[in-house]
Amino acid sequence: MSCSVLGKRTADEPGYSIVKKDGAFEIREYDAMIIAETLLDGSYRSTSGKGFSKLAKYIFGSNVGSEKIAMTAPVLQEAEGEKISMTAPVIQEKAGTKWKMAFVMPAEYTLQNLPKPVDPDILIREVPARKVASVRYSGLHSEKNIANWSAKLTEWLEKQGVKAVSVPRSASYDPPWTIPFLRRNEIHIDVL
């Protein structure tokens, strides 16, 4: 896994450079990356576990060739709404009553050599290089915290005069058993 109970992270992360830093807020330029993502219907809580399980099965060998793929961080999650391309970490984003969850694939893989998923609900795609605003926080990765930190990042972007071009998405870097105050969580928003 990517972290011990005490918080030591060992998982690879997507490459990026920091363009601007202001306390917990950053603007980053991410390299292009490949993600495995799935879209699920339901609440944040219910789709978090289901999405993670689907994607974990894929990287643990439920793919053509039964190849194991190293776990990376973060896990990305976002709500499905408008058609907005997704970026880095394990990410989760909301889409109406649907949530997207994605694992970033290790950098050594390409679309050509990455094992194909057996599960038809898992989509493999390349995410182009992009500029992303982020805010880092610790604690529980709850829907309430995601909404709170998304609002803070949106407000910071407005004060900076930076235009957001995506919905907020969450990025979690640690397994669920990590002590909450040691967890690394982030909110990401694509920007111009």
Where are these regions (language model features)?
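A solvent-exposed interaction/effector surface
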Residues: M1-L192
